[in-house]
Amino acid sequence: MAAQKIRSANINGLPRCKSEGTLIDFSGVPDPSLSEVKVLSPSSLRIDNPASLENVKEVVAIKDYCPNNFTTLKFSKGEHLYVLDASGGDWWYAHNSTEMGYIPSSYVQPLNYRDSCLSDSGMIDGLLENVDEGVKELDLLGDWTDSFNQDSVKKSHNNPFLRPSVSNPFLNGPLVSQTHAADTENSVDLLLFDPLAPSHVIASETSTDMLVNLLPNTTPNKVAVAVKRDNSFFRSKRSYSLSELSVLQAKSEGPTTGSFFAGLKSPAPEQFQSREDFRTAWLNHRKLARSCHDLDLLGQNPGWGQTQPVETSIVCRLDSSGGAVQLPDTNISIHVPEKHVASGETQQISLKALLDPPLELNNDKCTTVSPVLEIKLSNMDVHCPLTLELRISVALGGNASALNMVGIKCLRSDAREGPYNPVTQIYMYGDTVQVKLDNLEPVMYVVMVAQGQGIVSPSSVWEYINKKVTVGLYGPKHIHPSFKAVLAIFGHDCAPKSLLVNEVGQQANNPAPVTLQLWGKQQFVLPKPQDVQLCLFSNMTNYRVDAGDQGKIVRGFQLKLGKVSRLIFPIICQDPDQLSDFTLRVQVRDEFGGVLSQYCVQTPRPLPKTGTKSTGPRRFLKKKELGKIVLSPLAITCKYPTFQDRPVTSLKYGKLLKTVVRQSKNPYLLEYKKGDVIGLLSEEKIRLKGQLWNKEWYIGYYQGKLGLVHAKNVLVVGKVKPSFFSGPELTTGLLLEQILRPCKFLTYIYASVRTLLMENIGSWRCFADALGYGNLPLSYFCRVELESETERVASVLEKLKEECNSEGKEKKSFQKELIMALLKIDCQGLVVRLIQDFVLLTTAVEVAARWRELSEKLARVSKQQMDGYEAPHRDRNGMLDSEAMWKPAYDFLLTWSAQIGESYRDVIQELHTGLDKMRSPITKRWKHLTGTLILVNSLDILRATAFSTEAPEDCII
């Protein structure tokens, strides 16, 4: 059979076996030949040493499975299999008496499945009217009262039939277990199955009916009565839904683990005197639970993980004018040409990056170099093909043999599991690929692979390529005194923003997975499929990472098959009173201990404490905290690109329908003449008040000036530039100069700006060059030699401030020069943070004593809440000076903006709308907030043009 020709990727030279399973490391076995490996039954685990193989789980097949490729395992209904790795989700790695391979998880069920009386429908119905008859029929109690009177009892440690009430909602009482120390020393993390810890239960020698010995001082009759009274089976209701059984079980069972979250329970209504008190307690519990993802606690909630986005995806609807759909946070996009569909019709495109590729795409002769993309179309009446553009995570070897032996191909299928067929019309430039997709289907699956030509065993495609894999660190949204981080390895560069993680505590029923957030990631070259060790270190002694220095292992066969591997690292704070964010160092080592990759990640902050105090960022950094500034992962790994002054070609054009000449001049509102042509940066509209009422506006470019034009006065004609378009051509340099006009009118706090730049700028040299200090040595900025890169960045910033405040002929604006420099090195994320802080502070200063009126327009704040914002700033006599009114206003705006969300555009837009609603709005005299709104809405087109790596001819296939 073809599977017998698979060579082993293990460096110890294991003999070939009958499937891919030779890559499993059997530690402690004298001869690692699979022909001599015993079947791992529960009895053998009792007799032999269970510490080395304690994660093996026995399952039984519920239907036949015939594989269609050599990496999967054939089995028949009723056959017993032994699962070695179940972290793959849909596919588990298992073996029978002779072979190893992947099996579909839906075709098998755990051997202790009969412990659960739940039906597939999620309901338990059809119960008899006579309760005693139902008990007799289901044999739930059996002869358990006699079992207490028997003197001969025995203890079972790993019999799956002796795991009581945790998996059976009809039996009440927690599972009392003791965990061996060996459980924490296991270096390989198999996430789904729990280590076979001994469970102390008392059972009859002649029957499989058992009762957990939780009441040693209670007589058997009292125990039986208590269980019968509390048992949900003996209620009058005929049927129970799965959610009701979960509630009944949660009420009857005690805590199953001794973690930090053991006391974090959902409040019960009977604990409170009023409905409002219960509602407040429930909301606080929900807020805490959602911010501190404890896997043991939240895993018991079947609805939590299912409501979170996991795989990166986007859905967009386009009309006949075409456009582009880009997958968020990736280099993957679909270009839709104009007239792709008929005029008046639309095309809805769904694009999703799948985490795990099909098994048939990864073997000795082929390996995936991009995620599998799922493309869904709503309209099949199309007139032209689509263009898929993506970046591959591989580079061919430099020698000529690599170019002849291996080729980069695009495969396509109508089903996720295949079969996949090659796509002929592809075009490559560097690591970017463009694929022409014709013969469109409603659902398509596309993937890029490196495929060998003429490769014979023992060679593999890995010897001719440099494949890159991505390691990402995931954790909760807010850190906690005790939480868990997860390291995940992906076979491509599309690490999702959120990741589902499974971990079973002592529960036998499968809990829902927990969603964690991406903290940081890095890509590195993996020379060959091999066992890699992932280590995690903390930079503060107050935080201890369990098994972080020893690391955890990802097996080579998982990397070869492109499977996503998830390793869990518990992290504990030694002193919860000193809880703060810290830095984690991720290290990846090869099989010989050499470092393949390492990078640092700054953790998020703890959950803010509730109270009247502002939850926004502090305006000033304490002096003792200046030495604790740590560069963010973005600043460490970022390579700053070069700003290119080139024409902006993505404009749309419109015909002006009306002549407008303004009596009260506004530098950000255009004046124009009927019949002329105007360029539009985009068709997105901005809402703000005109002379009398709110209107919608386009950002337009007219005769060398950028500003707003009323949307009703423009007829959009398309992307083709008319020949009679007047005025200078819009370039990125001119666009940058135009959008930065309002910056010099914004107020800032220098200490806050200095802190942000020290945390996010990784190279003082690049920063200085962008400011115009090219080729100047470090001594020009500081008198003494500075060792820290953050201090060097601060010295460059200090020099800029001195020159801007000096009385020179050409006085510079500190804010404008700083924002311009940051945009030239593509620090848009840092720019929008600074702009938002500047806008909020400037608004607070401009509004001052009228901030209460603004708060009513924005959030309808009560008088008590307003007093709470002003209380910290009053003097001993309870008075608040008029010159200090900006402080409570700033505190309120920080809190309000945090509630709006992370969209800086929404924050500034809603702030402008709220100011327009005030009596005698300050936007009548202070017009620069309108300019700031133009600035933040023009950043995307500026960045896409100034830092584009595409040549004009590269855009066409």
UniProtKB/Swiss-Prot annotation:
Superkingdom of origin organism: Eukaryota
UniProt keyword annotations, A-Z: Coated pit, Cytoplasmic vesicle, Endocytosis, Membrane, Nucleus, Repeat, SH3 domain
GO biological process, one term: negative regulation of cell growth
A GO cellular component annotation in the UniProt record: cytoplasm
Subcellular location as annotated: Membrane, Clathrin-coated pit; Cytoplasmic vesicle, Clathrin-coated vesicle; Nucleus
Function: Possible role in regulating endocytosis of the transferrin receptor at the plasma membrane. Alternatively, may function as a negative regulator of the amino acid-induced TOR signaling by inhibiting the formation of active Rag GTPase complexes. Preferentially binds inactive Rag GTPase complexes and prevents their interaction with the mTORC1 complex inhibiting its relocalization to lysosomes and its activation. Thereby, may indirectly regulate cell growth, proliferation and autophagy.
Quaternary structure, from the entry: Homodimer or homooligomer.
Entry text on domains: The SH3 domain mediates localization to the clathrin-coated pits and vesicles.
Name of this chain's protein: SH3 domain-binding protein 4-A
Species of origin: Xenopus laevis (African clawed frog)
